[in-house]
Amino acid sequence: MASLLIAVIYLIFISLGLPDSLLGSGWPTMQVYFGVPSSYAGYVSMTISFMTIISALMSPKLISRIHTKWIVICSILLTIFGLCGFSISSKYWMLFIFAIPYGLGAGAIDSAINHYVANNYSGSVMNFLHCFYGVGAVISPNIMAAALKSARWNEGYRWTAYLQIAILLVCIISLPLWKKNEVQEDEKEEHSAGIAESLKVPGVVLTL
């Protein structure tokens, strides 16, 4: 059962990597569709990244209050909503609206899974975990390439959303596999830093 859960966790990290390469691979066609300069991709990417940072900074509070499996489910749902939103966007400004759930879905799930694996598995499992993020990041440009060849850029986002839905179903089916007594930090003994406190840590602002 433990090995099955590890497989699901690896699949979750493939899911995490899937949306990240779509904008770059599809933008040359998208910019023509929206009638905007190529540099405008940066604004969309910046919005997604900003929301990911916000989500990641909120993750300590979420992890201490919500079981990891529910953070995973909610995060994948947000990503699916963002991908579907991108696929139906007919105006450039619409991308910014759907970039919000698109980015929020990436930050907390990353931190939550890392936290879970660090507390429940060996370092080798953690190393392989991040390899599977790369698998997802490699798959999505190929999905977009297939969409551009046989359909439109919109389909690249839609097909990726379908793949995310399939992964979500696997996660839902696997809910009983998650440990009931997940290792959590005791808030009374160890304080979880909030956003303001995290930003005060030397080097954090420069890194962002």
Regions found by a protein language model. Name each.
Residues V8-I9, K91-A99, L206-T207:
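Short hydrophobic/alpha-helical segments at membrane-entry points of transmembrane helices
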Residues I54-W93:
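Conserved MFS/SLC helix-loop-helix module at the cytosolic interface between two early adjacent transmembrane helices
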Residues F98-F132:
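Cytoplasmic helix-loop-helix junction between adjacent transmembrane helices
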Residues L175-L208:
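Juxtamembrane intracellular "pre-TM" segments in multi-pass secondary transporters
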Residues L4-M30, F34-V36:
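Extracytoplasmic
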Residues M94, F128-K179:
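Helix-loop-helix hairpin linking two adjacent transmembrane segments in secondary transporters
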Residues G82-F86, Y102, C171:
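MFS-fold secondary transporters
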Residues S21, I48-L57, V138:
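Residue-level signature of mid-helix packing/kink "hotspots" within the transmembrane helices
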